[in-house]
């Protein structure tokens, strides 16, 4: 993906400054908000990457959308605008979140289910992930009706697949491989 290396460098610098100013948590909240908003708004992403729209317009739009930004986050937006890199703002935000979580030993857990999870079940899953990994986790929920039922949990490079579709595939494979012929 274009701009990923630059996004990592900007995120690292922003995190370093935020740690020095004891604002890493507040900046992380800003970055979560920025990441979600830009990813969910194609128009905003197009505006940020457009070479036709002036930087002053981009800045005023961002400050209008994100009214309560930390001064460090506002400064990061200014630097990205000055350097002509505002188009990678969402990548910088995503990289900041990743680096912040690494710093605080928080792992990303992705749970895939056929139906949305309720808050109680999310809490149970998070406690199990913490129990298994020994570190805090943030949960990202993905809906995929193809798994039919059950869930697939991924934490880092570990995966636990308890989906109905996996069990059906396993059963199908066992039935095909079964060489037992009953005697009549």
From Swiss-Prot:
InterPro entries: ATP_synth_OSCP/delta_N_sf, ATPase_OSCP/dsu. It is found in: Cell membrane. One of its GO terms (cellular component) is plasma membrane. It is a peripheral membrane protein. Keywords: ATP synthesis, Cell membrane, CF(1), Hydrogen ion transport, Ion transport, Membrane, Transport. Pfam families: OSCP. One of its GO terms (molecular function) is proton-transporting ATP synthase activity, rotational mechanism. The keyword Lyase does not apply. The keyword Metal-binding does not apply. F(1)F(0) ATP synthase produces ATP from ADP in the presence of a proton or sodium gradient. F-type ATPases consist of two structural domains, F(1) containing the extramembraneous catalytic core and F(0) containing the membrane proton channel, linked together by a central stalk and a peripheral stalk. During catalysis, ATP synthesis in the catalytic domain of F(1) is coupled via a rotary mechanism of the central stalk subunits to proton translocation. This protein is part of the stalk that links CF(0) to CF(1). It either transmits conformational changes from CF(0) to CF(1) or is implicated in proton conduction. F-type ATPases have 2 components, F(1) - the catalytic core - and F(0) - the membrane proton channel. F(1) has five subunits: alpha(3), beta(3), gamma(1), delta(1), epsilon(1). F(0) has three main subunits: a(1), b(2) and c(10-14). The alpha and beta chains form an alternating ring which encloses part of the gamma chain. F(1) is attached to F(0) by a central stalk formed by the gamma and epsilon chains, while a peripheral stalk is formed by the delta and b chains. HAMAP family: ATP_synth_delta_bact (MF_01416). PANTHER family: ATP SYNTHASE DELTA CHAIN. Belongs to the ATPase delta chain family. This is ATP synthase subunit delta. The gene is atpH.
């Amino acid at each position: 993906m274009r701009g990923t290396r630059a996004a990592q460098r900007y995120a690292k610098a922003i995190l370093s400054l935020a740690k020095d100013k004891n604002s890493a948590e507040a900046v992380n909240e800003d970055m979560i908000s920025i990441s979600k908003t830009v990813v969910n708004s194609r128009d905003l992403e197009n505006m940020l990457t457009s070479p036709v729209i002036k930087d002053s317009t981009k800045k005023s739009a961002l400050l209008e959308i994100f009214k309560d930004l930390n001064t460090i986050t506002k400064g990061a937006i200014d630097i990205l605008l000055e350097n002509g890199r505002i188009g990678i703002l969402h990548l910088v935000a995503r990289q900041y979140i990743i680096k912040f979580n690494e710093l605080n030993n928080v792992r990303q857990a992705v749970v895939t289910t056929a139906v949305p999870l309720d808050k109680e079940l999310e809490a149970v899953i998070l406690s199990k992930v913490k129990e298994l990994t020994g570190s805090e986790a943030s949960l990202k929920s993905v809906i995929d009706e193809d798994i039919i039922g059950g869930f697939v949990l991924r934490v880092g490079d570990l995966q636990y697949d308890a989906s109905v579709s996996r069990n059906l595939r396993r059963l199908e494979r066992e039935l095909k491989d079964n060489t037992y012929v009953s005697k009549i």
